């Protein structure tokens, strides 16, 4: 599809970045799911520990531009509310 060397290189780079970003996004989702599964199980200590990891992951993804800053804040707020509701 690309007609020039430059366009071919950009297509290669775009695919490489897409795969990297997909992996990072999947890792972020996994950290969030670990918190939610701990909340469902009723284990507040595990949920709190997992939340620290998820919070860091969400902030990193927002800083790198994989998700919007407000989405990270919204997710953290909702997860934290679920943890606090366990008490």
Curated annotation (Swiss-Prot):
UniProt keyword rRNA-binding present: yes
GO molecular function (one): structural constituent of ribosome
InterPro entries the UniProt entry points to: Ribosomal_bS20, Ribosomal_bS20_sf
Annotated SUPFAM superfamilies: Ribosomal protein S20
Biological process per Gene Ontology, one example term: translation
Top-rank taxon: Bacteria
Bias (Basic residues) ranges: 9-20
Listed Pfam families: Ribosomal_S20p
Region (Disordered): 1-27
Keywords: Ribonucleoprotein, Ribosomal protein, RNA-binding, rRNA-binding
Disulphide linkage map: none
Gene3D superfamilies for the chain: Ribosomal protein S20 (1.20.58.110)
GO cellular component terms, A-Z: cytosol; small ribosomal subunit
Primary role: Binds directly to 16S ribosomal RNA.
Family per record: Belongs to the bacterial ribosomal protein bS20 family.
Official protein name in the record: Small ribosomal subunit protein bS20
Lineage of the organism: Bacteria, Pseudomonadati, Pseudomonadota, Gammaproteobacteria, Thiotrichales
